[in-house]
UniProtKB/Swiss-Prot annotation:
SMART domains: AAA. The lineage of its organism: Bacteria, Pseudomonadati, Pseudomonadota, Betaproteobacteria, Rhodocyclales. This is Lipoprotein-releasing system ATP-binding protein LolD. GO terms for cellular component: plasma membrane. Gene3D superfamilies: P-loop containing nucleotide triphosphate hydrolases.
Length: 225
């Protein structure tokens, strides 16, 4: 089997405040293979988003470790961690977080421009992937001129434009009606498989989760098949 893209070993998280300790995650073990799609389901408040933040190096576990492309986040300084995360991970959230003053094309090109990719090349790559997600006719439209489903398509395109090793998606269709959610989720699965990108997606929708290669349940802080 190929080397895992992302590995969590014994990951636990305890929130502390006001003299109280609130355990959220306990002994999470997870290994995601290249090109694999993994769905994590669980009730609201079960810690799904917390787990995704830990897997993405956006937060530090109370115990255990998270390794991305062979490097342990805990062994990296803040700058190196950010660079490694930006190089290998893409993120999609329930809310699109597109910048209102920029077009869909400019929003999707933004990660490449931040990396100092030549502007013409960045815009060409953004146009290519927007076309692939069905927005080739909406390149110059701003977020306010797009439907909810179109905004999420643009957010997916932005997350994939820099060819990440793994995509982390937190309820990416949670703000959409059921029909649009099914279409957008199907598109997400299709794009990551075509680009051979690993995907970890958090969702409460079991029907959507069933489209992934593997479905895991998070219950009482424990992740299981």
């Amino acid at each position: 089997m190929s080397e895992s893209i992302l590995i969590a070993r014994g990951v636990s998280k305890v929130f502390r405040g006001g003299g109280l300790e609130v355990p959220v995650l306990s002994g999470i073990d997870l290994a995601v293979q290249p090109g694999e799609t993994v769905a994590i389901i669980g009730a609201s408040g079960s810690g799904k988003s917390t787990l995704l933040h830990l897997l993405g190096g956006l937060d530090t576990p109370s115990a255990g470790s998270v390794t991305l492309m062979g490097r342990d986040f805990s062994a990296l300084g803040e700058v190196d961690r950010g660079d490694w995360r930006n190089r290998h991970l893409g993120f999609v959230y329930q809310f699109h977080h597109l910048l209102a003053e920029f077009s869909a094309l400019e929003n999707v090109a933004m990660p490449l421009l931040i990396r100092r990719t030549e502007r013409h090349a960045a815009l060409a790559k953004a146009a290519e992937i927007l076309t692939a997600v069905g927005l080739g006719h909406r390149l110059e439209h701003r977020p306010g001129e797009l439907s909810g489903g179109e905004r999420q398509r643009a957010a997916i395109a932005r997350a994939l434009v820099s060819d990440p090793s793994c995509l982390l998606a937190d309820e990416p269709t949670g703000n959409l009606d059921s029909h649009t959610a099914s279409v957008v989720f199907g598109l997400l699965i299709e794009r990551v498989r075509q680009q051979q990108v690993s995907l970890i997606v958090v969702t409460h929708d079991q029907q959507l989760a069933a489209k992934a290669d593997r479905v895991l349940n998070l219950n009482d802080g424990i992740l299981c098949e």
